[in-house]
Amino acid sequence: PSWFAGSWIVSSDDGTYPVRFAPGADGTVVGERAFNAASVGRAVLGDTLLRVDNDPANPNRQLAALINDLLLESTVVARRSESLVEPEADGLAGSEQAEFFADELALQVLHQPGAPPRISRIETLSRYRLQSDGSIDGEQWQATYASPGSGLAAVPLRSAHWQLKLTPGAPPDAHAS
């Protein structure tokens, strides 16, 4: 949604990091994928992450270079999003609650020297709610499933849940690569 446009500081259990969203060619607001992935990656992995690059031939694919010649290839294979604007529960006239939901399924392949690639499926479900002060509260659930070659088990190998707070105005010198 349009209220996502701009630079933000995210506070979560993983730390604090900048993210950016800008209007795309069709006018819809999209995340700056490589920048945002590098920011989150550095918060989670620290110096293990060297860089994140978008694949110029496939907008749904990213490559993350890690130490020890590891390469993490992430490809979004399905996504869906929905925006809602509903009256606030307090019933006050003109009072609205804007929410945005996103669901993304990615296939990740970890390439490691001298070993076969490790494949996993990651599903991330996110809910964001615009606050009256212009900040955004977020909640994310992530489930990691075995590789497709291991069968299509409905039970995740791992799951995680995070609370996020996006505050407007990332410092202009904040950068990631």
Segments from the language model and where they lie:
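Soluble ligand-binding/transfer domains with enclosed cavities or grooves
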Residues: P1-A5, I9-S177
